[in-house]
Amino acid sequence: AADRTSSILLLDDSTIVVANPHSHTISFVDLYDQVNGKIEIDVGKSPQTLAYDSALDRLWVTNQAENTLTIISVSDKSVDGQIETAESPFGVVFDDSVAYITNQKSNLIQVFDLNNFTLIASIPVSNSPRGMSLSKNKNTLFVTHFSSGEISVIDTAELSVIKTISLGSRAGLTQAFVIDEGEAVAYVPNTMRNSDNKNLIFDNTVFPFVSIIDLNELIHLRGERIALDIIDKPVGMPLEAALQNSILYVANAASNDLTIIDLKSKKALAHVEVGSFPSGIDISESGREIYIHNSLDGTISVVDTEAFIVSSVIESTVISASSAVLNGQKLFHSSDDTRMSKDQWIACATCHFGGEADNVNWFFPDGLRSTPSLIGATDTGPFHWSGNLDEIQDVEDTIRKLQGGTGLVFGSSNCLPSCDTAEKNAGRSSDLDDITAYLGSLKFSTAYQKSNNKNEVDSISRGRELFFDKNVGCSDCHKPPFYMDNKNHMMPQVNSTSKSLNTPSLMRLSISSPYLHDGSARTLPEVLTSAPLNSVHGVQESLTSQQLTDLIAFTEAIEPPTQMLVEREYSELTVPQKFDSLAARAKVDFEINLEYD
């Protein structure tokens, strides 16, 4: 059974299995016959992590873009069936009888019985649950939160959160949680975001850290955290890690490298270059090899743990995306290319991981700005809150000014005096056009099955009528199908000034907080109740409390057009074979003990 989330697993000393998120497959690789010993199986869209149930010889795979799990028979190398999950499943780990699933966009940990797939519980947690690790005694489940840098501590008997540990309000991109049982600590790679900085440049915006958690006291040891740029060199996006005795291996996804740390001295032992976007690690039983999953190359780097060199590279898949889209995706997620970033500090994906938003407000030359999602961006220009980019290729200016890259085009960035008034950048660089192609390929995940509760359905219906009511005026600017109008408008501010701002899309609004250009509204009700009276958002006096509730219910339910949604691998789900003779796990009482043992 897997005790932590991972995209790559050694099943035994000869077989490794890896999730291929960009091929929508998993691969079994025979380490003794890497040429002919690969078996690749279609699963669902964007498989992220996997876990092996040795008792039933089954592999569970999370398909993040289509909200399903695929169950694989390992002996037959075939699909047993699928299970529907909540929205955006990422992590899967097992204890003896249940599977825990993180659902990143519905903020739930789902608990399924391993024998008959019964949904035992749905545990509500804070935003963006992602990685997990299970304590050795299986009493405690630790859950990382990708956007906030928080750790939820879950009692596995009570199936409830007993504590939340914060790495600090600026921590994010928090995925791995690596437990050191002997020292009773855990190591958490993360990126610290200097969002209070009003002069953002490449080397003062984000910082790579490994934070340390005391597992007895369940506290963050702030003074003990390891600054990777100090002990090694500037690296981009430390995302995954693995522990071997007193050595910690940290995969830096954006800078495409591995930082190897001696935990006794807290100094770097070595720095190893690997493939594109390393996002998973596993260690051989002998400890002589480390296997690094390079998700954007479709390869596995094998690292010799004595010489600290890459001894071989194994192909796990041939990524099916077009060459333009794949190249654009690699550039977007890379801080390793000097054209994209100076000294490996920051990538486009540092703030727009997977093309989405980081839920952070940043100071830019035109003011405090909330990071927007880029999914659907090619249909919703102009770009930036100020609407000052008239084409995606104008990100050339951001690459140069913020990321410190030399740029993807020769000569001017074509953003003087402003990007929208200068010559076009489209066609000047195939690489810049490829980034645009990648962003144009992004789609929203499959729509999650919403509640059929009559009261909720009725509230959404009433909200729809209000939204399109000319007296309320929402649809004057937020027009279907993208719920925006591709225009700028002068928007009154609470300080009696006005700003020219581009109309944002309202698609998938419920997961895009904070709201407004400056992130000043933490919730949707704040958008409507804190706006200046008689402004386009200032409807608080003209609508009743129930009408406000209904209007918000509708805006939260707005879905993208079908062509902007991921199409599921399976049109119908096949329920895997159940072992009904084995009863579903019964929930038992357990006295909570915060002492870690």
Please provide the spans of the model-predicted regions.
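Conserved core beta-strand positions within WD40 beta-propeller blades
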Residues: 15, 58, 98-100, 140, ...
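Short coil/turn linkers that define WD40 beta-propeller blade boundaries
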Residues: 24, 34-35, 57, 67, ...
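Periplasmic c-type cytochrome electron-transfer domains
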Residues: 135, 147, 154-156, 172-202, ...
